[in-house]
Curated annotation (Swiss-Prot):
One of its GO terms (cellular component) is plasma membrane. Coiled coil: none annotated. InterPro entries: Aerotolerance_reg_N, UPF0353, UPF0353/GerABKA_families, VWF_A, vWFA_dom_sf. This is UPF0353 protein Mkms_2500. Keywords: Cell membrane, Membrane, Transmembrane, Transmembrane helix. It is found in: Cell membrane. Disulfide bonds: none annotated. SMART domains: VWA. Its main location: membrane. It is a multi-pass membrane protein.
Length: 335
């Protein structure tokens, strides 16, 4: 949590938990203070003339004279927590991840069940996604129908990606597996270039499609979509699928109306096999919401951040109050 004026505070994920051993010292000091205070009170009761004492100091604030010591102990506890180094989850923009946007450009994308058409809506939302993706992400673009083509290799140049999106052209057949395999190859290539240390950069495939794979006819074939999804899982690349369209879509082929209903189930299985996530959208507005969700997932990562500042400031504040209370109540520091 974050408190006004104090900053982030957390009581978990301590980087230096051994600092809590200092609480033994704090407890010992508190115990010593109590022992000294009780002994002092006994001496006063034994030797003091109570009638004279009451006449000299009848309104002495006995109940409050321990407040400075209490505040001092509290401040030491708070400062100990700060020194132990609590942490909290912090979302920061990624700066070396790879995202491959894989878009289906088969003839079914001509369907107008989504205005103005499935492809036109996909182009508009995909360009917005490219604009809003965090700048450090390397974004690539693949278009696929019967075959897959890398239109833009992963790059931080968003204008190149948006220009290529505008130029997408429809083609025959749907080879979803080819699109996924091509994306994996592009990720491996760029990973060898921008990878830092011994591990490749984190990567993800965003697969945008409206229908069932037609080439090959069996998605479990070596070049099929399900085989590609399993390969993606083995390579640690989850696939986020977006099934776009309605059950009522159709296209005109040779002056005949051909139904092209969206196939949510196949895309969901691709996502499940790759340990990714499946999304559905049946309008441009829903598609924008899906892309916004993905942007938050892909563009940021959660790391451990410092959460000791709030404890440090609160401890310093209580320590200052202890000193002030000592001056006002006893005209001296507690002890």
């Amino acid at each position: 949590m974050t408190l006004p004026l104090l900053g982030p505070m957390s009581f978990s994920g301590f980087e230096h938990p051994w600092f809590f051993l200092f609480l033994i010292v704090v407890l010992a000091l508190a115990g010593l203070y109590v022992i000294v205070a009780l002994a002092r009170q006994r001496r006063i009761l034994r030797f003091a003339n109570m009638e004279l004492l009451e006449s000299v100091a009848p309104n002495r604030p006995n109940r409050w004279r321990h407040l400075p010591a209490i505040l001092l102990v509290a401040s030491l506890v708070l400062l100990t927590v700060a020194m132990a180094g609590p942490t909290r989850d912090v979302r920061v923009p990624r700066n070396r991840a790879v995202v491959m946007l894989v878009i289906d450009v088969s003839q079914s994308m001509r369907a107008t069940d989504v205005s103005p058409s499935r492809l036109a809506a996909a182009q508009e939302a995909s360009k917005q996604f490219a604009d809003e993706l965090t700048p450090g992400i390397n974004l690539g673009l693949i278009a696929y129908a019967g075959t897959a083509t890398v239109l833009v290799s992963p790059t931080t140049n968003r204008e190149a990606t948006k220009t290529a999106i505008d130029k997408l052209q429809l083609a025959d057949r749907t080879a979803t597996g080819e699109g996924i395999f091509t994306a994996l190859q592009a990720i491996a290539t760029v990973g060898a270039v921008i990878g830092g240390g011994d591990e490749p950069p984190p990567a993800r495939i965003v697969l945008f499609s409206d229908g069932k794979e037609t080439v090959p006819s069996n998605p479990d074939n070596p070049k099929g979509a399900f085989t590609a999804a399993r390969t993606a899982k083995d390579q640690g690349v989850p696939i986020s699928t977006i099934s776009f369209g309605t059950p009522y879509g159709y296209v005109e082929i040779n002056e005949q109306r051909q139904p092209v209903p969206v196939d949510d189930q196949m895309l969901k299985k691709i996502a499940d096999l790759s340990e990714g996530e499946a999304f559905t959208a049946s309008s441009l507005e829903q598609l924008r919401e899906v892309y916004a969700n993905l942007q938050q997932q892909i563009g940021y990562e959660t790391i451990k951040g410092d959460a000791s500042v709030g404890w440090l400031r609160l401890g310093a504040l209580v320590l200052a109050l202890s000193a002030l209370a000592a001056l006002l109540l006893n005209r001296r520091l507690p002890g």
